[in-house]
Amino acid sequence: MAPAKATNVVRLLLGSTALWLSQLGSGTVAASKSVTAHLAAKWPETPLLLEASEFMAEESNEKFWQFLETVQELAIYKQTESDYSYYNLILKKAGQFLDNLHINLLKFAFSIRAYSPAIQMFQQIAADEPPPDGCNAFVVIHKKHTCKINEIKKLLKKAASRTRPYLFKGDHKFPTNKENLPVVILYAEMGTRTFSAFHKVLSEKAQNEEILYVLRHYIQKPSSRKMYLSGYGVELAIKSTEYKALDDTQVKTVTNTTVEDETETNEVQGFLFGKLKEIYSDLRDNLTAFQKYLIESNKQMMPLKVWELQDLSFQAASQIMSAPVYDSIKLMKDISQNFPIKARSLTRIAVNQHMREEIKENQKDLQVRFKIQPGDARLFINGLRVDMDVYDAFSILDMLKLEGKMMNGLRNLGINGEDMSKFLKLNSHIWEYTYVLDIRHSSIMWINDLENDDLYITWPTSCQKLLKPVFPGSVPSIRRNFHNLVLFIDPAQEYTLDFIKLADVFYSHEVPLRIGFVFILNTDDEVDGANDAGVALWRAFNYIAEEFDISEAFISIVHMYQKVKKDQNILTVDNVKSVLQNTFPHANIWDILGIHSKYDEERKAGASFYKMTGLGPLPQALYNGEPFKHEEMNIKELKMAVLQRMMDASVYLQREVFLGTLNDRTNAIDFLMDRNNVVPRINTLILRTNQQYLNLISTSVTADVEDFSTFFFLDSQDKSAVIAKNMYYLTQDDESIISAVTLWIIADFDKPSGRKLLFNALKHMKTSVHSRLGIIYNPTSKINEENTAISRGILAAFLTQKNMFLRSFLGQLAKEEIATAIYSGDKIKTFLIEGMDKNAFEKKYNTVGVNIFRTHQLFCQDVLKLRPGEMGIVSNGRFLGPLDEDFYAEDFYLLEKITFSNLGEKIKGIVENMGINANNMSDFIMKVDALMSSVPKRASRYDVTFLRENHSVIKTNPQENDMFFNVIAIVDPLTREAQKMAQLLVVLGKIINMKIKLFMNCRGRLSEAPLESFYRFVLEPELMSGANDVSSLGPVAKFLDIPESPLLILNMITPEGWLVETVHSNCDLDNIHLKDTEKTVTAEYELEYLLLEGQCFDKVTEQPPRGLQFTLGTKNKPAVVDTIVMAHHGYFQLKANPGAWILRLHQGKSEDIYQIVGHEGTDSQADLEDIIVVLNSFKSKILKVKVKKETDKIKEDILTDEDEKTKGLWDSIKSFTVSLHKENKKEKDVLNIFSVASGHLYERFLRIMMLSVLRNTKTPVKFWLLKNYLSPTFKEVIPHMAKEYGFRYELVQYRWPRWLRQQTERQRIIWGYKILFLDVLFPLAVDKIIFVDADQIVRHDLKELRDFDLDGAPYGYTPFCDSRREMDGYRFWKTGYWASHLLRRKYHISALYVVDLKKFRRIGAGDRLRSQYQALSQDPNSLSNLDQDLPNNMIYQVAIKSLPQDWLWCETWCDDESKQRAKTIDLCNNPKTKESKLKAAARIVPEWVEYDAEIRQLLDHLENKKQDTILTHDEL
């Protein structure tokens, strides 16, 4: 259509529409109402500059301090520049150290305030010092404070005599090689003048190695601004109005809050209004009016017919697929997030049949390959799965940073496109192995052989027998050496007696275990069996074995140890002689034991083998080559540990037989010892998992290794790159070969230790097929030509000689006699070998200079943190050092094997097919290995592809000539996952360059609405305020143009580990009715706590210690919060905020009976008495704690009937300060009442219920109210009510555990809280708790119910009434499942119940209920009334005591006659009349109206008082 014609059409359309709208009246296009929700942190806004520094610290400590140097006084500009300018200034400074991708990631980190908790953590640590008054910055020097720079010197003088401070893993330590220095901790705000002044002095002292300088962020005057968060979802769900739940005391919401007048999408019913307004700017007003009209007409929410629902998912996909590709994801976001008002228009979309067919084909393929069902959602970034249920914005940031690091490194090596994905798929896995020693060694004396000894001749030999069932705890007896125990012992030590006894037990009971000994004996040839028991035993053993057999020799050894005196426990020569004389009377004792014995062969072999293995102190034991842990070497522990490993190995062997990799032709020992994790030597330095890798990749370094002055100013990465670029190698051949392993040895080769390391490396190189060897010089003393004679000889040889001669000459220089001769004055040329290019060598030797040694020494000092002369090794970029002991040829072999098996072999395989120059291939492998291995282990990558992509896959291409992330998304556009994923994909598209494929994984034949809520995912690629000059409230969920008729409920969907609460709202967020509001509904939430979760197990029993209590606090407040350990998974949770916390056992029984013996996920070393837990992130923190009982408390149990003598403060799953009184001990005569409520109406009911309880008892009452869903108004009023009526209360709080199946509907979540967490919601001091529904009115003293005898049941419920006959048709429990399940038992109502918590915990009722819930909740149609269906379903596993019927009366089910006996009245819903509860309450319970009026009077009084306070304040 021609432009002129199009313009005329639009004008005609708008003209007629405007006329029509004017006739309909202005009300049609009135400003629409909206709902907004914010979430703020509990702490104030933190400075972006400090957050940027934490981002840098994650990159490296070096980058942190480099960034710090450039921004020392940057905060000064904050006073003069706008937020926008200052924000850009920070990004500009950061840009000096980051590439474009990481700048985008920094912006994203700012947006989600990812590093704010780290700043707040330091703020909390500073508060715990505490800071001196009036100081902008201060230092702490071994417990002494000052904010004066000139006092630092004085405080340092006696610092060593004071306690050294604890340093956290997240502390920023100024780079230095020395750790054992006085620690000076600076608390200051980076970027301020005060900080700069302190930093100048402290950094100078640190460089001079006078102090260890540590920086911790400290903001003396925190911002007054709230810090709004993002990375969470907000749902506006449509509520059922079957039973009216609105509070008629509410007034209409009047608010001046405004929301930007914008629509969430420019597209409305096919019109792209954004583009239309650009083209026809003169018609903007008319277009806006037309747009609003279409929106209003679009908001009709008439229910859809069943036949209209069936194809909705495909119809949504058709509309999305037909949109322009770059608008399609935004359209999916609009449709999914606003589905209730989009559903009607979707029914008019014709389904593209090509798309439908293609979707079904792809779904079949995905189902087969990945088990992805129609409707399932998956997101993959570079093949890594992003679990939408678990991953949050903070985890995604971490993932993108790690991926970006690898991708940048590969790009700098010239790798792009598909080649890059090959390398990304590599995963460093070898370090997960448990390494085992090769036990095929002649030094092991095997006392039995299952395969050849007659003792086992009747046993079956076939591996198939492994598949046959055996008794639990037993191992199949098969005539194969599948189980092997090796004991390393010194026969003349006290411990040996127990080990001989253990071997005898296994041998004599015919346990299917081959047993071997390695005897570590005196190796002095002058020592014989006449005066050394060990040597005597060895010679006797060899004699008996030779004359008879090995088994006879072992039995004789057992007899020798049986003769050991009980008070000595150590073998003597006499014990050996006695057995020889008694058992072998014809033997000549001195021929066997004496100095000329012929039975002394291989005496030294055991000691030699033991030394070669690298095992720790004796005794040692191996099972199939795997060493036992130190704590398992106790003889009782060892016996059980051996049997357990045999059972574990049997399971492994069964699997291998089943898979066919193990059969009857397989040699058992070779099968076990040919696995990848079998090594010739255990070297903990090589095998440890906390490894340091060098970054050898640089894009811009041109410095020469001899250019010391330039090298001095390079950073660590560039220094490493220069060393790598200028390294010379000894290889297997002079031809160009590819070495998958590059070894650098670091030493002072002018010292004996350095030459020994060189000798062992050369020894390894003789047999190596994968390695090349480079040399790094680290001289001990000041460098000159005199003290580098050997090193210069090595260097000159590397620079001038071919490999064959180079290896031989280096071998010469490694000999001590030659080195001694050279230093005695002999010329080095004297020792040149035949075939060397002697002229070239001499010329280079005389001209080489010492600059290269200075460069190497600086590299060792700055990058490797080695002192002069210290030794180390680098293997494919992995640094091991400093070496404290000899590094043997076997160690080099082990290191090569592991490096090659880990990634070297795989990288080599890829590289060989890439056409890279052979000379560069070995360098390339080394650099890629160093890069990929430096990244923490990642999950497996999936290669997800689609059979066809023409009609069902949205594809967007990345920007050309730049690296890109490969993103695969699979989602049904009408699911909760699509609501979140759409916004995430939009944000990712602005952060990273990505190639995306989005597959429409639609479900067909829908029978109900797929979505029943509006949704917003609050996430942006960068800060909204600060990133532009427009003032903004910060991240916010905005629901614009929402229909006014439905009743809505607002839900926050936050990351795991967040506990949020509402702090302000201008209406009832459980019952939002926009018809009753003037304009905007606002909800303000606060992140109240970050959750600390954990698992706890008893180390001995490996069972959770049920009822164990932990406390979390600081050194000044040891017990701020506490919690109880569940039996289920040993799970516990504690509430905290950013900071450094101390985890302890609760004072009382927990501390008396148990001790903590191990922990993971904490910030402190395992041997530290205090367990330090640092919370410095929005991500979940999960701990693992091991405990064991004190020796004298083995038989004691926390959950016994004795009184709990606690001294700590119960406060873990409650608020910190809500209680008027805190009890430290059990109070017998108190009524503990538990209740839950959500929404203003039910809070009104709750207050009335509480008053009715109080009016009918003289016993002190304590209410336990679930805090999670209480409104700000209720929380504000409850303290006044408590004071007025004289009761106590706790607001209990618990986060639904992640491992327990989640509920999504508010009512069902609340039902879950009523029943699923009774064992952990309340302290152990509470014996009994009574649950009373909020809509109940009590007419009797509940003390009677508390004291009611439950006959041993853990809880008592009232059965449903049967007396109102007209309701028989509604009694669901009388028919179907419930009738058959209950038989003649009653179905109980959950409106009122009493729980004996001691009994409940003792029988594990909570865990039983949770397990059954987990099983039943898989079916969404089960547990329709969760809180009462679950206990009734479990009636046979967790008994219910039926309470007398009088305890609960409700009109729906009970006849009128029984009302007069009612002790409580419940306002049950009536499925027949659907009468609202408010009407029913006033009609059924006369006193309800009186209670209501009384409380209303109190609330009015409080409101008037509040208004008076505000007026007085304003006047002042």
From Swiss-Prot:
A motif (Prevents secretion from ER) lies at residues 1513-1516. Pathway: Protein modification; protein glycosylation. This is UDP-glucose:glycoprotein glucosyltransferase 2. It is an enzyme of class 2 (transferase). The modification Phosphotyrosine is found at residue 1289. Belongs to the glycosyltransferase 8 family. PROSITE patterns: ER_TARGET (PS00014). Its main location: endoplasmic reticulum. It catalyses: N(4)-(alpha-D-Man-(1->2)-alpha-D-Man-(1->2)-alpha-D-Man-(1->3)-[alpha-D-Man-(1->2)-alpha-D-Man-(1->3)-[alpha-D-Man-(1->2)-alpha-D-Man-(1->6)]-alpha-D-Man-(1->6)]-beta-D-Man-(1->4)-beta-D-GlcNAc-(1->4)-beta-D-GlcNAc)-L-asparaginyl-[protein] (N-glucan mannose isomer 9A1,2,3B1,2,3) + UDP-alpha-D-glucose = N(4)-(alpha-D-Glc-(1->3)-alpha-D-Man-(1->2)-alpha-D-Man-(1->2)-alpha-D-Man-(1->3)-[alpha-D-Man-(1->2)-alpha-D-Man-(1->3)-[alpha-D-Man-(1->2)-alpha-D-Man-(1->6)]-alpha-D-Man-(1->6)]-beta-D-Man-(1->4)-beta-D-GlcNAc-(1->4)-beta-D-GlcNAc)-L-asparaginyl-[protein] + UDP + H(+). Glycans are attached at residues 256, 286, 920, 950. GO terms for molecular function: UDP-glucose:glycoprotein glucosyltransferase activity; unfolded protein binding.
